[in-house]
Amino acid sequence: MDFTTTEAAQDLGGLVDTIVDAVCTPEHQRELDKLEQRFDRELWRKLIDAGILSSAAPESLGGDGFGVLEQVAVLVALGHQLAAVPYLESVVLAAGALARFGSPELQQGWGVSAVSGDRILTVALDGEMGEGPVQAAGTGHGYRLTGTRTQVGYGPVADAFLVPAETDSGAAVFLVAAGDPGVAVTALATTGLGSVGHLELNGAKVDAARRVGGTDVAVWLGTLSTLSRTAFQLGVLERGLQMTAEYARTREQFDRPIGSFQAVGQRLADGYIDVKGLRLTLTQAAWRVAEDSLASRECPQPADIDVATAGFWAAEAGHRVAHTIVHVHGGVGVDTDHPVHRYFLAAKQTEFALGGATGQLRRIGRELAETPA
């Protein structure tokens, strides 16, 4: 593999770091807590004005044509300050899927406006435990969708959703507008305190032109969702561990910094190894996905095992480092007046969203079992 990132990725990551560090102060985060939906429109506007949304978007949607490595760099930087913006959902996943699989009409009608920031798109991939997929019944000139999806990021503020569903001829992904009859979104309270919704489709009608594609689209969305969440998690853990190390250097007990105690130092060292392992596997996965995207549009992607490996590290390291952050900070770690508690919550949210470390290991096992020797 190639460990060297691109110059564009370095530049974009640095620019986003500068923007989010300036905007996402502890005071600003507390102001976001007062909103009905935690969507940082001020930061979103600054990212739009700086060209961040369009920089790594496909040229077919009016973007600059950079790719996965650059998007990963942006997501890591957004994670550093727990940025409450739908870059992952709207630009990377939804607009990316439309650019890769959608018709020219869908690209121009929805993808371009997502990349420009005029519309917010999201993806509805997850159902409640034990719940079947959304069902799409043909109606002659379109489909009627029935079912629910949960944990839809930025669902309460989204203009449209990409929804996988089962049809008579197999799986397909549809674009469903928030204003379509039969579409209802309920806001959810979640661990990460973000804008998350429950999507209910009660016979929502979509015409055939809103069909984005088949099984390959759903597979692509699942792979990119895991990769993107992993990138954001890296940013969260990096900054959270930095804050914890700084606290250990300055907090004194028994007339010496607590970081000088062996047990504390070992805990921080373990966290450092976890974060480095996550960065390594994320880099491998992003590079493989980027190579596959350039080589072919066919799915399933051979990068699946690499992405699941990175997802395992994001969940496992997320659990360990999140608890290290709280434990080393002591009482401060659970004081909501201190910003560090937000990193614990964000890390746990991503861990749960990925299905935990065990879920990713099972995914790797299935891929290995199904791969010919």
UniProtKB/Swiss-Prot annotation:
Cofactor note as given: Binds 1 FAD per heterodimer.
Tagged with keyword Hydrolase: no
Cofactor: FAD
Keywords: Cholesterol metabolism, FAD, Flavoprotein, Lipid degradation, Lipid metabolism, Oxidoreductase, Steroid metabolism, Sterol metabolism, Virulence
GO biological process: cholesterol catabolic process
EC code: 1.3.99.-
Pfam families in UniProt: Acyl-CoA_dh_1, Acyl-CoA_dh_N
Binding site for FAD: R251, H327, G331
Keyword tRNA processing on entry: no
Catalysed reactions, as listed in the record: (25S)-3-oxocholest-4-en-26-oyl-CoA + A = 3-oxo-cholest-4,24-dien-26-oyl-CoA + AH2
Superkingdom, taxonomy of origin: Bacteria
Induction (record text): Induced by cholesterol and repressed by KstR.
Pathway in which this enzyme or protein is active: Steroid metabolism; cholesterol degradation
Molecular functions (GO terms): acyl-CoA dehydrogenase activity; flavin adenine dinucleotide binding
InterPro entries given in the database record: Acyl-CoA_Oxase/DH_mid-dom_sf, AcylCo_DH-like_C, AcylCo_DH/oxidase_C, AcylCoA_DH/ox_N, AcylCoA_DH/ox_N_sf, AcylCoA_DH/oxidase_NM_dom_sf
Activity: how regulated: Uncompetitively inhibited by high concentration of 3-OCS-CoA.
Similarity annotation: Belongs to the acyl-CoA dehydrogenase family.
Record text on subunit structure and interactions: Heterotetramer (dimer of heterodimers) composed of FadE26 and FadE27.
Function: Involved in the first cycle of side chain dehydrogenation in the beta-oxidation of cholesterol catabolism. It contributes partly to the virulence by increasing the efficiency of beta-oxidation. Catalyzes the dehydrogenation of acyl-CoA ester side chains of (25S)-3-oxo-cholest-4-en-26-oyl-CoA (3-OCS-CoA) to yield (24E)-3-oxo-cholest-4,24-dien-26-oyl-CoA. Also able to dehydrogenate steroyl-CoA such as 3-oxo-chol-4-en-24-oyl-CoA (3-OCO-CoA) as well as 3-oxo-4-pregnene-20-carboxyl-CoA (3-OPC-CoA). It dehydrogenates only (25S)-OCS-CoA diastereomer.
Protein's recorded name: Acyl-CoA dehydrogenase FadE27
Source organism per UniProt: Mycobacterium tuberculosis (strain ATCC 25618 / H37Rv)
